[in-house]
């Protein structure tokens, strides 16, 4: 798919997206505590760089709420008296770009699998609450010392007598208007609200309402902090989770939109495209960039037909900032905070977590991820969420259901007799199947359960259809299980064993057990009965 010359539809879609990019860029820069110019330059360069090798026609690579929040957490942890936050931010973006390119070169696109969708949903939910709460001081018009979420809420409560009613009224009105304008998808509601906010501040004196102030759009030469092993190593520690979340978020957006329209994408190529976009952002002292969900859906809704939409969006953003840049100085800060809150409304929807509860799958993991972000901060919360996700997966694999199988009618199919009472288990043979692959954490437990459940039966079949491979622990446990069964006069037959498993048994010296394998359960039943016949 070539970038091509922007069509009329792409140009219109690009302008519509640019109308969303400008307020979001200014808002996300505020989340990170950086100049809006950094986010604007990042959005321009991200869009232009991505289309060079990226393949998603709907992706608009620009600063995202999650990347801004993670960057803010990193800057808060790394910023010291001798460290310039702008330089640290540039270093974070540069290392992010390098990590993306390295991951693409090493074909590590599958790494996003370490962040399950429930974890990502819980993380996004907790992150959205965190960002929204941090906008409250701006909306109520009182400065509150930054700290963890609970300290901020306590500070807001203490400062209640000093809350500014004009600021609250303006922020609330802006948020209500933003939500109302969502009923007109092709109208850039955020841009309309920002324009109205500028108009109100110019026409009416607003006591107690803070203004954004002038934006310096001068392009400066990027600078990195002086080299220090301690600083640079800590930056890498913060950057790796940022890269993981950025790609998980971006790939989720790209893939969902691609599947919706029958497009095909390659994870490795998109990793490289995101790497190039972040390197381009670092070259202009920008912020981390990725393909955000809200902007990607806005691009689709505006009628984007090719990647040229992103080019048109970048050019539209240049025109917008040239025409309206001086006016942004008059923008009331509560209006900008309302734009941030409105941009995160979709992430505050509990419906995906409620659906997990309804399905009784992974809801604890999702809620734990959200609570971890709220209690321990963005970065620590994300790491805790990933660990919880892996722990939940390990627990499920370590305690699999071991089903006893029976024949379904006169067919050759063998199914779980607990789930299918109509299935008939053979009277002279017990057939077992673990619901998960055998590996070091469950092999002993599964084989012990089979031994216990088989009772006095002398013919035992173990179906290994879920085990495409075995680690050394599972291999040894299987051989020991067979040897123990033989001492008790029990004959073991393996069904549906994969070629790799048979090869492993042979290499381990268990040739006789490797020979007692069948391609189907039905064949295994015939084989074990035949061997038992004198």
Positions of the model-derived regions?
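Intrinsically disordered or compositionally simple regulatory linkers and C-terminal tails
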Residues: 1-2, 525-534
């Amino acid at each position: 798919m070539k970038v091509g010359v922007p069509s009329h539809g792409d140009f219109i879609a690009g302008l519509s997206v640019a109308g969303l990019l400008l307020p979001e860029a200014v808002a996300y820069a505020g989340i990170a505590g950086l100049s809006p110019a950094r986010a604007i330059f990042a959005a321009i360069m991200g869009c232009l760089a991505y289309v060079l090798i990226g393949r998603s026609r709907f992706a608009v690579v620009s600063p995202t709420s999650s990347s801004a929040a993670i960057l803010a957490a990193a800057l808060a942890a790394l910023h010291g008296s001798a460290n310039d936050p702008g330089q640290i931010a540039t270093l974070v973006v540069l290392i992010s770009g390098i990590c993306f390119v390295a991951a693409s070169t090493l074909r590590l696109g599958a790494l996003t699998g370490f962040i399950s969708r429930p974890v990502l949903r819980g993380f996004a939910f907790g992150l959205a609450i965190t960002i929204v709460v941090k906008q409250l001081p701006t909306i109520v018009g009182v400065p509150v010392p930054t700290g963890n979420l609970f300290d901020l809420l306590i500070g807001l409560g203490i400062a209640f007598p000093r809350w500014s009613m004009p600021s609250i009224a303006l922020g609330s009105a802006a948020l209500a208007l933003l939500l109302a304008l969502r009923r007109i998808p092709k109208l850039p509601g955020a841009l309309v609200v920002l324009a109205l906010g500028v108009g109100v501040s110019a026409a009416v004196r607003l006591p107690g309402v803070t203004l954004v102030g002038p934006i310096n759009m001068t392009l400066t030469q990027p600078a990195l902090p002086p080299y220090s092993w301690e600083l640079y190593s800590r930056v890498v520690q913060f950057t790796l989770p940022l890269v993981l979340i950025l790609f998980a978020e971006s790939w989720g957006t790209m893939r969902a939109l691609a599947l919706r329209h029958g497009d095909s994408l390659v994870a490795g190529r998109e990793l490289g495209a995101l790497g190039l976009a972040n390197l381009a952002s670092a070259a202009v002292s920008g912020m981390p960039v990725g393909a955000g969900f809200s902007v990607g859906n806005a691009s689709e809704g505006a009628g984007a037909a090719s990647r040229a939409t992103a080019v048109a969006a970048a050019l539209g953003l240049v025109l917008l900032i040239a025409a309206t840049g001086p006016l942004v100085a008059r923008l009331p800060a509560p209006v900008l905070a309302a734009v941030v809150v409105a941009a995160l409304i979709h992430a505050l929807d509990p419906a995906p977590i409620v659906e997990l509860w309804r399905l009784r799958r992974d809801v604890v993991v999702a809620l734990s991820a959200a609570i971890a972000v709220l209690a321990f901060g963005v970065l620590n919360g994300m790491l805790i969420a990933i660990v919880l996700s892996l722990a939940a997966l390990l627990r499920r694999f370590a305690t699999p259901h071991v089903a006893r199988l029976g024949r379904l009618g006169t067919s050759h199919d063998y199914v779980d007799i607990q789930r299918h009472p109509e299935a008939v288990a053979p009277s002279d043979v017990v057939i077992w199947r673990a619901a998960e692959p055998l590996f070091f954490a469950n092999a002993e437990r599964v084989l012990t359960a089979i031994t216990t459940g088989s009772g006095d039966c002398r013919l035992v079949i173990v179906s290994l259809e879920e085990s495409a491979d075995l680690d050394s622990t599972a291999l040894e446990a299987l051989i020991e299980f067979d040897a123990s069964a033989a001492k008790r006069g029990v004959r073991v037959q393996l069904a549906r064993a994969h070629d790799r498993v048979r090869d492993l048994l042979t290499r381990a010296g268990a040739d006789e057990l490797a020979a007692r394998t069948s391609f189907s359960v039905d064949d295994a039943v015939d084989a074990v009965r035949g061997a038992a016949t004198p």
